[in-house]
Amino acid sequence: SERVRLQNSGDYDEIYIMLQDGTGQAVQLTSNSDSYKYSLLWSPDSKKILWSDRLFRLRYIDIDKKQIVEVAKGKAWEIRDYTWSPDSSWVAYSQQELNSINKIYVWSLADGKTIEVTDNWYSSYSPCFSTDGKYLFFVSDRDFNPVYSRTEFNHAYLAMSRIYLVTLTAEVKSPFEPKSDEVKIGTAIETSKGEKSDIEKASTPAKTAAEKVVVKIDEAGLRDRIVDLPIEVASYSSLTSVGDRLYYIRRNMAERQSSFKYYDLGKREEKDLGQITSYVISADQKKMLVAQRREFAIIDLPAAPIKIEEKLDLSGLEMWLDRQTEWAQIFNESWRQMRDFFYAPNMHGVNWEKVRAQYE
């Protein structure tokens, strides 16, 4: 029932939370910030907010304690790719190394331990925990199929990526292990007490994501448990796990178009869902907001190509504007961005404070 917002307070934005209906007073969580913040992300238990900043830090704040904890600090660049585990006890993120390769790490909130998931040989990114906490999905560039030019003695690597998963504990079996074809004789379909038979129990849906999940990670042999999904080489993004399904957007570089798909780990098959621009799955994992160009719709989680029948009517949206306040914010934000993002810290000798005063 709460929402988070960034509000300018001094030189940098601060994090506030407030009720969704706008009633009551907003609660300020951070103060005296020293850098730009990126991509605020609530934890699944709604007790923490994770973000990264211009100073290469990845941090979260405990809502109740109002305590900021540093998860990691980038070695070569900003950390812009991160996610929570379903039990809010781990953070997975990718970080650019000094050799320009992106590596995936997981960090434990319990003891502050950092574990390397991938190595320095292949760039890996877009980590995504499975909803049951057994796997970590990610994208990695491990295929080298050069395309040669007809006019130059040169080649380029256009399609290098696949989706991979790693089983987080040694006890969890890979979903791609050979299946046993042994037939077991179950009990009768109907029992005298009306209880479910063995056959019925086997077909009962798994526990919902709302039930408690505890994520455990065995560091020993972690990289040896990495396997690739049997899908084509392309560019992948927007990984989201729901039960046995992993939703993602694939871009085929040869065809220059994107397609929306999911892979079913139980059935070991990929399904095409058509073409969309982007999507977001609701917290209860029952609904999906999809965008097709400039049109939006809320639909049930799809299992077949998407056909938008009821589009969201956004014609009634209104925005309250204070033009003078908005113009002042635009001016101040432009000044701050030049100060913080200009490649030369000394601004080429220009007195930047004086420039601000000159135009205010």
Residue locations for each model-derived region?
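Blade-terminus and WD-like Trp-Asp/Gly-His loop motifs, strongest in beta-propeller folds
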Residues: 1-3, 39-48, 82-90, 126-135, ...
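A flexible loop/linker signature enriched in serine peptidases of the S9 family
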Residues: 6-16, 22, 30-37, 47-63, ...
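Blade/loop signatures of beta-propeller domains
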Residues: 16-18, 203-222
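Generic, well-ordered alpha-helical scaffold segments in large soluble proteins
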Residues: 18, 91-94, 107, 120, ...
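Short coil turn/linker residues within repeat-based beta-strand modules
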Residues: 22-24, 65-67, 111-113, 170, ...
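A short helix->beta-strand "capping" segment at the edge of beta-propeller domains
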Residues: 26, 213-232
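A short beta-strand motif characteristic of beta-propeller blades
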Residues: 26-30, 67-72, 113-117, 227-229, ...
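Intrinsically disordered, Ser/Thr/Pro/Gly-rich linkers and terminal tails that flank
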Residues: 149, 228, 238-241, 248-360
